[in-house]
A protein has these predicted regions:
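Donor nucleotide-sugar binding/catalytic pocket of nucleotide-sugar-dependent glycosyltransferases
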Residues: 149-205, 274
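N-terminal subdomain of nucleotide-sugar transferases
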Residues: 1-58, 239-241
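Conserved donor-binding/catalytic core segment of Leloir-type glycosyltransferases
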Residues: 199, 211-238, 250
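Nucleotide-sugar-dependent
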Residues: 229, 283-288, 295-317, 324-334
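Conserved acidic donor-binding segment of nucleotide-sugar-dependent glycosyltransferases
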Residues: 337-349, 357-363
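A charged, aromatic-enriched C-terminal amphipathic alpha-helix characteristic of glycosyltransferases
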Residues: 346, 360-395
Length: 399
């Protein structure tokens, strides 16, 4: 197959789309990626990529369009989204006209898949979307608008138009199918199929890991630092826990609440208890997992977005560690089945209780949780299984 992949992010941005493209090349397919110049988490274009419009990396042909870098402000993020939308739509007009199928991955915002829609429509080929985020649901959950407002209704109309133009939708969480049926009104049940997103593949020396002070219980959170991840309640819970146990919490990542996190650490005098490490590549983040007592997962149990299976969950399970999870929805169901987590609700009290419950576990119980998570990952989320499903979907919709 000759495959066109459209995604705003690609290597060195830390997203699993890179894993997918390189897998398809290894399986003998001709793969071209249309993406933006990398800037995620850097507040600028990554050095060396400023003038790099085309490259071939591990067999993948990559076209990079100019984007306005994200700088942390809401306006810069909007400009970043719109610059990719505009420049990528222009670029697809200049691409070869002989691709067999288009594959896109929908992260926020969903307009980033518009170039894929444009190419597929122009050349009358099928478009397969891998949906990792729901619109306009995400806009509501992040507090930008509310259900029923004029802005929401306009976004809903736009979303329906875009989603209905797609030939096949792979959803990263089972509950997303309910959203497409009841909210987006896609009645043909054969259009949607549950296919998790692959775990980001990284190279790491298993003997290269961070040494913790064993006088403390050491926990790690790795991921987006935002409202959806329930960061404010986590901070309040840690503040309470410092009076109950010797605890250190290591946080890796970036997000809208990064500055809020830093301010609260200072305000509550938690410098010895919350260590913010900033953004790190997945390969480096793993170094903090090995000797940690457990990994923390938080996701606000609100709306359909709150029912998702975050990619960090499968990343955690792959690393064979116990998990403390403040979640609901599909992710909660996964962890109930794996029997590898202490699960709680989103409240401060619930989070505190979960950490106290974990503290009382003996070492064999923790080791069993770790093993359970890894075995569940191998059975349900192993990349070879998921990537093969993606390839099969593309073959089915190839002209």
């Amino acid at each position: 197959m000759k495959i066109l992949i459209v995604s705003q992010h690609y290597y060195p941005d830390p997203f699993s789309i890179t894993t997918i493209a390189e897998y398809l090349v290894k399986k003998g397919h001709d793969v071209t990626v249309l993406t933006g110049k990398p800037n995620y988490g850097y507040y600028r274009i990554v050095p060396g990529y400023e003038h790099l419009d085309y490259e071939v990396l591990n067999g993948v042909k990559i076209y990079r369009v100019n984007v306005i870098p994200r700088k942390g402000t809401k306006m810069s993020i909007v400009k970043n989204y719109l610059s990719f939308w505009k420049n990528a739509k222009n670029k697809v007009n200049k691409l070869d006209d002989d691709f067999d199928v288009v594959y896109s991955m929908s992260l926020s915002p969903f307009i980033s898949i518009s170039p894929a829609i444009k190419y597929a429509k122009k050349h009358k080929i099928k478009h397969v979307l891998h949906c990792l985020d729901l619109w306009p649901e995400s806009v509501v959950i992040t507090g930008i608008t509310k259900y029923g407002t004029l802005f929401y209704n306009l976004l809903l109309m736009w979303s329906k138009k875009i989603y209905h133009s797609i030939d096949r939708i792979l959803v990263s969480s089972p509950s997303f199918m309910e959203y497409f049926k009841n909210i987006i009104k896609i009645k043909n049940e054969n259009i949607c199929k549950f296919v998790p997103q692959p775990t980001l593949e990284t190279k790491n020396n298993s003997n290269d890991y961070f040494e913790y002070d064993k006088d403390y219980l050491n926990f790690v959170y790795c991921g987006n630092i935002g409202k959806l991840q329930n960061i404010p309640n986590l901070i309040e819970a840690i503040k309470i826990l410092t009076y109950k146990m010797k605890i250190r919490f290591y946080i890796i990542g970036l997000g809208a609440l990064k500055d809020y996190l830093i301010e609260k650490i200072s305000e509550y005098n938690l410098e010895n208890n919350i260590i913010y490490l900033g953004a790190k590549p997945a390969s480096e983040a793993r170094k903090y997992f090995k000797n940690a007592d457990a990994l923390y997962l938080g996701l606000k149990d609100e709306g359909f977005v709150g029912k998702t299976i975050p990619n960090k969950l499968t990343f955690y399970m792959q690393n064979a560690k116990p998990i403390i999870a403040s979640i609901g929805g599909d992710a909660k169901q996964v962890l109930l089945e794996s029997e590898g987590a202490v699960i709680c609700d989103n409240s401060v009290e619930g989070i505190v209780k979960a950490f106290e419950q974990f503290k009382e576990l003996d070492e064999p119980s923790k080791e069993k949780m770790s093993l359970n998570n890894f075995e569940y990952f191998q059975k349900h989320f192993d990349n070879e299984i998921i990537l093969n499903k993606i390839e099969e979907e593309l073959k089915k919709h190839c002209i």
